[in-house]
Amino acid sequence: MSNAATGSRVLYLGSDQGLMRDLTALVEPKSVQLVQLGSASALAQELRRLAPEVVILDAAAVSVEGGLAAFLGTLYGGEAFHPRAICIARAGSGEDRMEQRLAALRAGAASYLVPPISVKRLASRVLRMCGIVETVRYRILILEQDASHAKKIASLLATIGMETLVVDDPMKILARMQAFRPNLVLMDLYLPGATGSELTTIIRDHDDFYGIPILFLSQEADLDKQLAALKAGGDGFIKKPVSREALIAAVEYRMRMSRWLQDRRTLVNRRETAGGFLPRDVFMRHLEQITRAREAQGGVHGLVIIDVDGSQGILNALGLTATEKLLRELESLLSKTMTPEESATRMDDFRYGLLAKRETLSKLEALASTLCQQLSGLKPQDRDIKLEVSVSVGVGLFDPPADDAFAMVSRAEKAAAGAKSAGGNQAHVWSAASRQNGAPEAESVIKRLVSTALAQDGFLLFFQPILSLNQQEDELYEAQIRMKTLDGEQMPPAEFLSVAERAEMMPRIDRWVLRRAFEVMHAERVAHPRLRLLVHQNVMTLAAPEWFPWFRDQIIKRNLTQIYPVLELQMADVRQNRAEAKVFIERLRKYGIQVCVANVTGIREEISLLARIGATLAKLAFQTIRNADRIQLTEIVQALQARGVAVIAAGIDDQATVSRVWTCRPDFIQGNYLQLPQPELSFDFQHMSHDG
């Protein structure tokens, strides 16, 4: 692959002068030469002479029978050198079908584009194939009185493409930040006229800079003074004299995390389109908030699931591109039926969710019927293809109150499944008849449900990501159990675990959860090689003599050596059975198996106990996260970390909480603000680890 500095060549076979002009303007400044050719013979000749990095083939310029795929096969057939090929299909020719894409891919194409062509995206693709990475320069403000030290830091940051501004007067910090708009601030902890802690307090009080990462440059070894600086809002320390490795690692990670939080804040507050579509995770979080509110808000709310009938047949008939165009038209029609208060999302490839509100139940049912009629009138753009489109619509009602967002999805999906099994192209409304007007299930009924679930594999695991703030690359999820009920809903653990405990069923449930966790870890070991699961257990389950041999056998049977779950215990359980907990935790640690204790309030007795029994992680109680101020929370985090216990701040459900918790420097954060629990491992840890 040629380097941009020595020049890269791209050959274009085609006659679109506008494309040639616009593409040249975008790639020439990157030292890429674009050569236009008018015939296949000229291309074959120049291919040998110029050895280009990329060839762009316009189907309109190819007259070979078999199209682009056949031409590529001929072009590459006798050549040892194969540049990467971008194929452009002809508009309205039917060349956007899956068959043509597959044929081109198998003949050697690296990319297959269908008009209309975005020249900017094409240019970006060409540059990547030429080995030219387009980078964004991030800005770092350095507040340092020592000019030579500041210059050294600026030079080190320049080597990784950072733009820097050195400031030596702390009194000018806000003015310089307003003008420079940095992505991160590096400042000396001790400055003439003001300390770094004081300046950080002022910066955090400024609306524009509240969330900007601030790292201190210091030789300060006094833990109390470090703590005071962190309490003021600092994000961390870089020890003087600064080493290149420590500087770059700290800066890149803090900026990456800051950008993620800014992206998340933007995502939560935006609409994908003017039609009221939301990203799926934002939609689910909004649904969760409405579900938990449980107060009458006027009108009748419902979750509407729209499931396209015969989806595989549509995909086979139209191909991927035409199918997506059809679904875009469906989305447009759906948005026209929505009021400004309503929102929708694409749940998966062929299912949509609509959070609807109408004045009465009959009007909500009428909406579902209207959706069936309107969406069933969709036709593919290619009128020669005879295709009937229909949808099955299911409406899940909020009355009686559901436990969470996924219970609501279960209601709507059950109704949609009923509509589909009845022949499709119709709407069904979820019935609450089996729930006795919302009355809670009797304990005897729940006990029978648990027994049935144990006998018939009636439990589910959902997974919620736990995000490291300390540059760990593991993918850590908490595995959360749910139970399927007779009416198709999913019962959260709070509703059945206490009953199971009184019925002495917890050892069997604990084993089911661990066994299922092992199955997931084994199945996902290739796709998620750094996966770790946090798995709930009870002290007395683990203390039983037969438990450890069973646990070891599960690991050996699935060849999961060195791939262990993290076992999670409840603080109240540990306090009640501290002697047993200490014994088996010590045994587990010898094998490298970690233990997390949850619902830690942060009182001195708990912190001391966690250190004595050898727990490696502590998950703070929700009420501690909600009620403690930033200084109190920081002191709890620091006290645990000083004893070798890493801290998980859970219950991060909104921007205000994440902003407050962020500066307290826990090791991990978890909550619905990151992602609601999902039935699959879908959080983008890779983006978090390597975006930068």
Curated annotation (Swiss-Prot):
Keywords: Phosphoprotein, Repeat, Two-component regulatory system. GO terms for molecular function: cyclic-guanylate-specific phosphodiesterase activity. The keyword Repeat applies. Residues 443-691 form the EAL domain. GO terms for biological process: phosphorelay signal transduction system. Disulfide bonds: none annotated. InterPro entries: CheY-like_superfamily, Cyclic-di-GMP_PDE-like, EAL_dom, EAL_sf, GGDEF_dom, Nucleotide_cyclase, Rev_trsase/Diguanyl_cyclase, Sig_transdc_resp-reg_receiver. The modification 4-aspartylphosphate is found at residues 58, 188. Residues 299-432 form the GGDEF domain. This is Uncharacterized 76.5 kDa protein in phbC 3'region. It comes from Thiocystis violacea.
